[in-house]
Curated annotation (Swiss-Prot):
Keyword Oxidoreductase: no
Pfam families: Cytidylate_kin (PF02224)
Catalytic activity: CMP + ATP = CDP + ADP; dCMP + ATP = dCDP + ADP
Catalytic activity, EC: 2.7.4.25
Residues that bind ATP: 12-20
The name this protein goes by in its record: Cytidylate kinase
């Protein structure tokens, strides 16, 4: 068995179920959790809280370097704790999203956040949720999973989520949005969405979440025992 801190990466397209899988894996393994998709929103929110200009690299880099954030799996949700405060609700606000877009466009800030994400690698272990965790952020991770599902299945899942919230949405619109996002993610010049060469590819299209978790755990346990 390797003496290094165990790292499990889960990458994949939007709507494949990465968040749910990572939360359940972190709880079952007793590992820490990193939601890389939320990290830019967290930094943007920290900037807003501290009155820092979200377009100033010089001001944002030290904030990113020392970002005090935790992701805690609790019940069916992941709580985001920024500087000791639960900011899960604030992260979803439009103001935070707009600020995050500005922050994400700054190269030195991206580099600082890359280092900050790598600092999550600590005992007893880490489950990292994202799009380039196994290819860019943690290329030496012992267990890498690429969780996929058909665009149609992901649109169906999203449709059900939104309908459960009482929203009136069309399947065709959701499918189109997902296909466009897939195209952007897979063809972007920096860190395109793709499985790491040594990743287990899981297609969850016709699998239940319990089946996905079982397959993932079998794979992780075998990799960590090597």
């Amino acid at each position: 068995m390797s003496s290094q801190t165990p790292v499990v990466t889960v990458d994949g397209p939007s709507g494949a179920g990465k968040g749910t899988l990572c939360m359940l894996l972190a709880k079952k393994l007793g590992f820490q959790l990193l939601d890389s998709g939320a990290i830019y929103r967290v930094l943007a929110l920290a900037a807003i809280h501290h009155g820092v200009d979200t377009e100033s690299e010089d001001a944002l880099v030290p904030l990113a370097t020392h970002l005090d954030v935790q992701f805690i799996a609790e019940g069916d949700l992941v709580k985001v704790i920024l500087e000791g405060e639960d900011v899960s609700g604030e992260l979803r606000k439009e103001e935070t999203g707009m600020a995050a877009s500005k922050v994400a466009a700054l190269p030195r800030v991206r580099e600082a956040l890359l280092r900050r994400q790598r600092a999550f690698e600590a005992a007893p272990g880490l489950v990292a949720d994202g799009r380039d965790m196994g290819t860019v952020v943690f290329p030496s991770a012992q267990a890498k999973i690429f969780l996929d599902a058909s665009a149609e299945e992901r649109a169906n899942r999203r449709l059900k989520q939104l309908q459960d919230k009482g929203l009136d949405v069309r399947f065709a619109d959701l499918l189109s949005e997902i296909q466009e996002r897939d195209d952007r993610d897979r063809n972007r010049p920096v860190a395109p969405l793709r499985p790491a060469e040594d990743a287990l590819v899981l297609d969850s299209t016709s699998m239940t979440i319990d089946e996905v978790v079982e397959k993932a755990l079998q794979y992780i346990e075998s990799k960590l025992a090597e």
